[in-house]
Structures are given as structure tokens and as C-alpha cells.
Amino acid sequence: MAERTHACGKVTVEAVGQTVQLKGWVQKRRDLGGLIFIDLRDRTGIVQVVFNPETSKEALEVAETIRSEYVLHVEGTVVERGEGAINDNMATGRIEVQATKVNVLNAAKTTPIIIADDTDASEDVRLKYRYLDLRRPVMFNTFKMRHDVTKTIRNFLDTEEFLEVETPILTKSTPEGARDYLVPSRVHDGEFYALPQSPQLFKQLLMVGGFERYYQVARCFRDEDLRADRQPEFTQIDIEASFLTQDEILDMMERMMTKVMKDAKGVEVSAPFPRMKYADAMARYGSDKPDTCFEMELTDLSEFAADCGFKVFTSAVESGGQVKAINAKGAASKYSRKDIDALTEFVKVYGAKGLAWLKVEEDGLKGPIAKFFGEEDANVLMSTLEATAGDLLLFVADKKSVVADSLGALRLRLGKELELIDESKFNFLWVTDWPLLEYDEDADRYFAAHHPFTMPFREDVELLETAPEKARAQAYDLVLNGYELGGGSLRIYERDVQEKMFKALGFSQEEAQEQFGFLLEAFEYGTPPHGGIALGLDRLVMLLAGRTNLRDTIAFPKTASASCLLTEAPSPVAEAQLEELNLKLSLKEEK
């Protein structure tokens, strides 16, 4: 078999007159009265191959048996197309290959999905036949971008003198965070490893070990409920460094991301990226990962509402809640009563009891609550919301958390429905100064907002023992277009501070020692100040490639129920395998 001389998508007018050897898949076959045209495809693109009896009867006879997705080896001569046959939409659209020989390397059954960017296959079918789905050019281009992003990051970190170090996949289960995937030990009866949710502890121990600058393209595993932008196994760019301040870490990440955007996407973004404190993000956008590609900020009306004529507003403020509003500029005519009812049901999903609304017309406010506002209140309301005729005003009165969640989600929905989001924009943002701890009323305890190893502000360390809810974290999240790309922090590196953190989280001294004794001891041997960040590679590629689902950036992903339709994992195992592990199954009975 002769060696391939050209990739299909790389045959251009410069090759006219040359004999070429091509190998690839049949994208399309057309029989035009004695001539057969085949579009031959490989990962670089498509080239048209012509089978003509005047060139080779033998090749034509073989071509008559060929169908879509057959794998071919074609030998032929490159010729220019006639004027009427030129296709400038293809890189190879000015030439075609006159076939002299063809060899079928492998036949193919009729495929269950159309191998094209605009395939009509359902996602389940695409996942079941993932190896066929991956043949689509849009999928290859996505993974080419993933490769380019990873290569750029590796090259950048190498120039910054970071070492790539692999950390264990079989590790210790810890109680914080999401559920672990557990792996039973055959050697140690009744004991289990856990697959890592992140390399957090090991990368900190590498700092204790004096490596100073570490990174890893790390596989991570979390047994949590899935959604469009979550997978049970995922990849993060994990970075840690000693002796750097928060500003130095953020500056380095900005330089890295601007290079990624330029090299992998061809887009120039400016640095430094804007910074916003967590409290401001929640107040202005109702989100800790605000999409700043469009305006429409939340406006706090609590002071006005405390003394207005609308009892729903006043009672919310009196009970310690708040009232906030969104002004959807020019949207009054675009939303009917039925549409607003749909928005009301939408905010109820986020805990809101309802959605109050007003439309601004030339002669004043109109809507079901307009009667509660006199002329003076109406003027204050319009002035505060900068409202003009044609605007739609939307209000939620409730607990602060409910107001933020519901209006934050509503803002994003309106942004999409009103086409306010410029898809060509890439707006990076740092969200800083996070709360260190969050209180869970159901569990009646504090949880770490990021993780238990985040350094509080120095002046807040004592608050861990007196008022944990007031302690601030030296933490930072990187946001792109409303998606959290990753998060990081400066880390605790002193035993006494780490013990205070564990105590605030409800750990007894014995529990802390049992779970994290190795880390606490390490902190007694001269641990340097350190910090870092973990960036979600899958999510970054999803955004840069213009995909809407993380599954499109992972070669062999899981479904929303964490199953693989291709291999049918997870699956039962043989009884003998369980016996080797000294395990017995006790399955719940189906009701």
C-alpha cells in the first residue's frame, strides 16, 4: 500500500498535475450518468474525487460498489475544475482528483447517524455511537481546540518554570465537598480508596516539599447530581505556587489566559481583568459568577419599599428581607400577560413566592400593582430605576438569598430572550473577597465556601472562634461570560490556623487528626506561604468552541445519569470479583 501523500483538505491548486495518494472516508457518492463523484473526507476536510471510464474503467467499477463511510485509498491526478464547477466554499473547491486506482480498505454499514455538522441524531444516539459522532468535523475541531488550549497552557507554565507533577488517583476519602467515588481495597479488608475530587492536598504537600511551582492537567471525580455543565469525571488545570501574593497569582493567570485566547481562539483580550467583590456581584447581578456582557443590573428598593403603599413590599422589609427590581429596557411591548405569568413560574423555581411587575407608559405606570403607588411614589420608583416609557419593571420581595437567586436567574433569561448578549464577546472577571464559610440551616453547621484549606484574611482569623460567618476568604474565582472557569485562593499553611478552621467547620480534634493528621503534621516542618487555582479545562473549551454542553468537549462523556451509553458502564460485576474483595451486595428493593 502506497503512503499517503496529501491530506484530503490540503490538496490545492499548487498540486495540479501531480499524482496523489489519498486515504479517507466517503462523505458522499453521486452517480451522474457514467461518471461517479465521491467526496473523500479525512480530519482536514473534503476533496472531490472523479471516477471516469476514460481515465480508469477498473476504478469506476470499484466505485460503483462504494457507499457512504467506506474507507478508501485513492490514487489519482489533480486537475483544475471547470469554471462552472468551482466551489469557493471549500478549501479544495478549485480542484478535483481524477482517480486512476481505488482500493477499499474497509466497508461500512449504513450509519445510525448522519456524519455531518448538522446531524439530526438525538444526543442518546450520538453518545451510543460516539465513535461515529466524533467523525463530524465540528467534533474534531472542538478537540483540536482542546489540544491547542492545553498545549498553550503547558508552554506558558513551562516558561514560568512550573513543573508538571502527577498526583495519586487512589487516595483517601474525606468528608468535605461532594460525594466520593469509592474503590474497595482487595488487600485491606473493609477499607476503601477514593478517586480524587481534586489534587488539593497533594499539591499543597508539594509546596511543603519545596517544589515551589507545580501544575497538572488533572483528572478529577465527583459523585454529584449532574447538569449540562457538570460531569462525574472532568479535567482541570491545577496550579500551585509558593511565595506569591494574590495579586501576583492573578496577574500570572491573566497573562496565561490572554495567551490562550490569542493562540487557541485568535482573539485579543485586554488585561488586567476587572475585579469585583463577592458582595458587589451578588448585590448587582444576583450571582457569584455574573455575566457582564450586558447591563440590566439589580436595583435595591428596600429603603423605598419600607415606607411605600404596597404591603407585600413593606412586610418583606419588616421581616428582614429585601425588595429588588430589574428594569428590562424597552421590553414592555414584548411581554404579554401570559409571558409574564411564565416569568413568574420561572422565579418560583428559585424560591420566590411571586413576581410583581409594572409597565411604563407615556402617562405613567400600568399593571396590577400600579394602584398601590401614588404619584410621588411612582416618580421615586421611576427615577430610582431610570425608567422611561416602554420599559418593563420586574420586582421580587423575599429573603435576601431568594431575591438574589431568582432575579439573578431572571436577568440571564431576559438577556437571552431580548438578545442582549453579544456572543462574540469574551468578558473575563475576577470575583474576590468571598465569605470563608456558609451556614447550612438544614445541617445546622458551617461549610467552607470553597474548601477547608482556604486562608482567611489575617485580621479575620480570630473570627473563626467568635463570629465565623463574618470571616472573609483570600479567595478568587475567574468568570467568563457568566460561567465559573475556576477558583483559587491563598492557602492556610500554619497548623494553628488550620485547626481553628476545622473547629469552625464542626470537626472535633480527633476527627481532624483522623482525616487530616498528615497535613497538620506537615505544617510543623516549615511550610511556605502558598496559593493557587484550578481552571476547568472542559468548560473553557466549551466556551471557546461555542458549544452549549460539556459533553461535546469530552471524547467519551457520561449522560445526565452518569452512565456511558457506549460501553454500558456502570454494569454488574461477577460474583467472583466481589468475593475477592470480600464484598456482598445489599440492593434496595424497588418500590
Curated annotation (Swiss-Prot):
The record marks G84 as: Important for tRNA non-discrimination. ATP binds at R222, D223, E224, Q231, E484, G536, L537, D538, R539. PROSITE patterns: AA_TRNA_LIGASE_II. One of its GO terms (cellular component) is cytoplasm. InterPro entries: Aa-tRNA-synt_II (IPR004364), aa-tRNA-synth_II (IPR006195), aa-tRNA-synth_II/BPL/LPL (IPR045864), Asp-tRNA-ligase_1 (IPR004524), Asp-tRNA-ligase_1_N (IPR047089), Asp/Asn-tRNA-synth_IIb (IPR002312), AspRS_core (IPR047090), GAD-like_sf (IPR004115). Keywords: Aminoacyl-tRNA synthetase, ATP-binding, Cytoplasm, Ligase, Nucleotide-binding, Protein biosynthesis. L-aspartate binds at E176, R222, H450, R491. GO terms for biological process: aspartyl-tRNA aminoacylation. It is found in: Cytoplasm. One of its GO terms (molecular function) is ATP binding. Its EC number is 6.1.1.23. Residues 200-203 are annotated as: Aspartate. It catalyses: tRNA(Asx) + L-aspartate + ATP = L-aspartyl-tRNA(Asx) + AMP + diphosphate. Aspartyl-tRNA synthetase with relaxed tRNA specificity since it is able to aspartylate not only its cognate tRNA(Asp) but also tRNA(Asn). Reaction proceeds in two steps: L-aspartate is first activated by ATP to form Asp-AMP and then transferred to the acceptor end of tRNA(Asp/Asn). Belongs to the class-II aminoacyl-tRNA synthetase family. Type 1 subfamily. PANTHER family: ASPARTATE--TRNA LIGASE, MITOCHONDRIAL, ASPARTYL/LYSYL-TRNA SYNTHETASE. Homodimer. This is Aspartate--tRNA(Asp/Asn) ligase. The lineage of its organism: Bacteria, Bacillati, Bacillota, Bacilli, Bacillales. The gene is aspS.
